[in-house]
Amino acid sequence: MSIAYISHDKCQLHDMGAYHPEQPARLSAINDRLIATGLDMVLRRHDANPATPEQLLRAHDDTYVDMVFAKSPQQGQVSLDGDTSMNPHSLEAALLAAGAAVQG
């Protein structure tokens, strides 16, 4: 038996700082736990492909998708709402994470 594990190293670049729960350490902790439990032996690792706009629109309305793309910063950080912030790598990381869900 094998289990698909779909992710991408670029997701580690969505780093909103130590104060924010969305940080690369969470992905590292998941990988460490998979290794510690031996589950990594049955994983088939795959790099995620980014979700397409059409795939995003299956879960989000076009106004929201357009807003996220428009607010993606070239530098620094921007806040989309009280819980969601973006850095220059966040859009790509989000597209890869959504793509992983579609692939899975």
Segments the model singles out, each with a brief description of its role:
Residues 1-104:
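HDAC/HDAC-like amidohydrolase catalytic core signature
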